[in-house]
Amino acid sequence: EERLFSVESQHEGMHKKLNHWTFKNNFSFQHSASQNYVHWQSQLKSKKKFNLADAQMALAVDVLQSNIKLIPELSVQYQLIEKGLYSSFELGGDRALYTLRDLYISNPYLQYFVPEDTSSEELPSNTKYYTRLGLNGNLFGGVSYQVSVAATSQDNFMHYVHHSNALDEWMAPAYTALKSLELHAGLDAQWTENIHFWLKADYKRFDQYLSYVPNMELGLYGFYHYNEQFYLSGSLRYIGERYAMRLDELNYFDEGQKLDP
């Protein structure tokens, strides 16, 4: 059983030094299985324009139960070529509390499992920090591109592993501290208001062995807007190699089976 109640507020204004500012608050109450969680997030964000750059700065206070975290955020975009090429830098993070819904949806086999089969009945949270460098620009009429490299650190990344003992086999979520490096490239083409295509590619490197998590993903997406009532959309995706991990009854690594892309 799971219930979630959330209230959000937002205030905006102008200031001589802060320019445009936004103050957001989110309060949520989550009941999952037999546990209750209270999560409050508050963020003050400011935008400022310079000659060739746009900057966005924020500071968030995240309170989960009695644990408090301060999460800074910085985003800067600088114009290299007028209306043609931009560089960007991002630094930020967030904390998310897992839900039972997350556990079921992320299960690669969607098989039934009991939350008590995990290491603890209490759901963990995942705190993520990242930094990203990127370039984006325009090629020719209606076609734009972007490339970026990002480094990410997470304290409780969730993936699914197989467990076994002398009597039974089952699947359950595992949580691990994870550092990763991601390369991203994208191409966007919108020649008319009705036809839109975009291509994206992502490649990731992890410092841990993960189960059912691909290291590469390619995608081609299309959208055609016929009129106010009808539209067509479609996609082609390729997922890179993955491994299915199996742990023994003492939670030691037993084997890893390579899956077909």
PLM regions and their residue ranges:
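Transmembrane beta-strands of outer-membrane beta-barrel pores
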Residues: 13, 27-33, 48-52, 59-65, ...
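Flexible, glycine-rich linker and terminal segments associated
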Residues: 64-68, 72, 77-148
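Outer membrane beta-barrel strand-and-loop segments of large Gram-negative receptors
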Residues: 122-124, 130-136, 146-198
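Outer-membrane beta-barrel domain signature, especially the mid-to-C-terminal portions
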Residues: 101-123, 154-178, 204-219, 238-261
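Repeated loop/turn-to-beta-strand initiation elements of outer-membrane beta-barrel proteins
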Residues: 14-23, 50-57, 82-87, 141-147, ...
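Residues on the lipid-exposed face of transmembrane beta-strands in outer-membrane beta-barrel proteins
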Residues: 7-13, 27, 42-48, 61, ...
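Outer-membrane beta-barrel transmembrane domain signature of Gram-negative proteins
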Residues: 1-51
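Residues that define the transmembrane beta-barrel architecture of outer-membrane proteins
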Residues: 3-7, 36-40, 68-72, 125-131, ...
